[in-house]
Amino acid sequence: MSLQMIVENVKLAREYALLGNYDSAMVYYQGVLDQMNKYLYSVKDTHLRQKWQQVWQEINVEAKQVKDIMKTLESFKLDITSLQAAQHELPAAEGEVWSLPVPVERRPLPGPRKRQSSQHSDPKPHSNRPSTVVRAHRPSPQNLHNDRGKAVRSREKKEQSKGREEKNKLPAAVTEPEANKFDGTGYDKDLVEALERDIISQNPNVRWYDIADLVEAKKLLQEAVVLPMWMPEFFKGIRRPWKGVLMVGPPGTGKTLLAKAVATECKTTFFNVSSSTLTSKYRGESEKLVRLLFEMARFYSPATIFIDEIDSICSRRGTSEEHEASRRMKAELLVQMDGVGGASENDDPSKMVMVLAATNFPWDIDEALRRRLEKRIYIPLPSAKGREELLRISLRELELADDVNLASIAENMEGYSGADITNVCRDASLMAMRRRIEGLTPEEIRNLSREAMHMPTTMEDFEMALKKISKSVSAADIERYEKWIVEFGSC
């Protein structure tokens, strides 16, 4: 036995398998496996032996696959033969049914004699004739079962054909939205899928009433997004919808929350875009992503593109820290925003594409982008009334003690942002639990009942939380925002 023989047998086995001659292939595979087993006993080197064992396992897997194919083919043959046998049996069974009505003894008997005999001797012929008729037309139980089976099968076939017709009608209505799918010809498939993942299909479930205060910002967003779809005949020409809205303000004032409310309430295709979506390490891919984003937005219009922290994407151009790739991406973004195929070009407000942006650093944004974001609104810190309303929204699921005065708490929170107020409410709601488990072992904590843990939040809890949590926005920051909005604002 030589290695050359093993190699030749493996080649023959694979060739026979490819040609569909699985029986011959299995013979060669089995011979190769036996030859390799004999060869393995003669190999002394452990490293070489491991390699041969690995090869043996691979060929064994191939042999198993061929064996599975043979089993599948055999099952097909069994099904065909059983069907053919059933078809051959059916005429024989039917022949037995119809052979009885034509007995040989009936032919020589003349009809008139039969009738006369029935008149003279009524009992005997009367008893014989029904017996022959019954024998002729009474099917056997097996044939009755077959006939019933045929009727049931024919009924099932009719129901299945009706079901198929209904199914064929249903997908036309159900899959009609799926047919309206963006054609990404000319773009990388991964880029298209990455941007499709940024389309918010799930409802963020944030309503306008979930946002305290910010009445002017809500009105502007409704005017920019909702009203053009309700009154398309009005928003034409100089009254065209706003192409871009920039929300400016300190952190934690509700800019991203407003964007979530737009996605929930406005019923437009909502693209949630960040710097990671539009940047790539490959040359020229960032510009393609920007162009693809706006083409998809035009296709799925009316659409809203929300760019959070837009200062990180489109900062001021011409600085020494700017890279060439970043500059090209900014240029493409500016071109696409100015040429958005929405109401400004098509005079169709229902096909608009609006860019909604948010930033904490408006002074770092490029001047050309600032011009394209036509409405620049200030999202300030909540007022006293807004703070009280935000407290009610945050604490609506909690049980409060009778001594809690939300108006007094709101007055003590002057200068706090919306996020700061939420943190105070969260910390105050945990105070009662902290007092309850103080000094207890882990086992005792696990055995506490739900009623023991759900205790009302008191005024003292809020006072302690206010001492622990300070405001996150300084007066100097507020002054800087107000100065910028006075100079560049467009409310």
From Swiss-Prot:
The modification Phosphoserine is found at S42. The keyword Phosphoprotein applies. Phosphorylation by DYRK2 triggers ubiquitination and subsequent degradation. GO terms for biological process: cell division; cytoplasmic microtubule organization; microtubule bundle formation; microtubule severing; neuron migration; protein localization. Residues 1-29 are annotated as: Interaction with KATNB1. One of its GO terms (cellular component) is spindle. It is found in: Cytoplasm; Midbody; Cytoplasm, Cytoskeleton, Microtubule organizing center, Centrosome; Cytoplasm, Cytoskeleton, Spindle pole. ATP binds at G249, P250, P251, G252, T253, G254, K255, T256. Its main location: cytoplasm. It holds the Pfam family Vps4_C. ATPase activity is stimulated by microtubules, which promote homooligomerization. ATP-dependent microtubule severing is stimulated by interaction with KATNB1. The keyword Chaperone does not apply. HAMAP family: Katanin_p60_A1 (MF_03023). Catalytic subunit of a complex which severs microtubules in an ATP-dependent manner. Microtubule severing may promote rapid reorganization of cellular microtubule arrays and the release of microtubules from the centrosome following nucleation. Microtubule release from the mitotic spindle poles may allow depolymerization of the microtubule end proximal to the spindle pole, leading to poleward microtubule flux and poleward motion of chromosome. This is Katanin p60 ATPase-containing subunit A1. It comes from Mus musculus. The lineage of its organism: Eukaryota, Metazoa, Chordata, Craniata, Vertebrata. The gene is Katna1.
